[in-house]
Amino acid sequence: VIVFSVQNPPTAEAQIVNYKSESCGCCTMWQDHLIENAYTVEGVNVDRMDLKKDELGVPQNLRSCHTAVVEGYIVEGHVPAREIQRLLLEKPDAKGLAVPGMPINSPGMEVEGAPNDPYDVIVFYEDGRQEVYASYR
């Protein structure tokens, strides 16, 4: 007998707080991507994102335009919803995930007709370690 267990994705309960600049359009588009993937998102406009990133401990080399927090994890930049879901399912002993910069055609950075920028989703830890969590090519 083979038994399969289907676990509800954690997206239904996951509350995401997204810190962003008020004028950032791609930050709002990323929030829309998360909402389309069943997350509840609260956008919080911040005047000095650099100070918010410092407060949360986002490494300089991983920074992007917006910084979110979900279930104690930091999500920096245009991280795809599926990688957030994976993070919440696996619950690694990590500080968070990041997509450094603003890769074209990553979630929230869609540009019709433009080629996709390859990018990595990086998992980062309190001790400073950083590893590739997923790659998009």
Outline where the language-model segments fall.
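Short active-site oxyanion
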Residues: 15-16, 39-41, 71-74
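Active-site-proximal beta-strand/loop segments in catalytic clefts of secreted hydrolases
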Residues: 19-21, 44-46, 78, 100-102
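Stable alpha-helical elements in mature extracytoplasmic
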Residues: 23, 30, 45-48, 80-84
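Local sequence-structure signature of Cys/Sec-based thiol-disulfide redox active-site neighborhoods
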Residues: 9-37
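Thiol/selenol-based redox catalytic cores and closely related redox-interacting motifs
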Residues: 55-137
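Hydrophobic membrane-insertion alpha-helices, especially the h-region
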Residues: 1-4
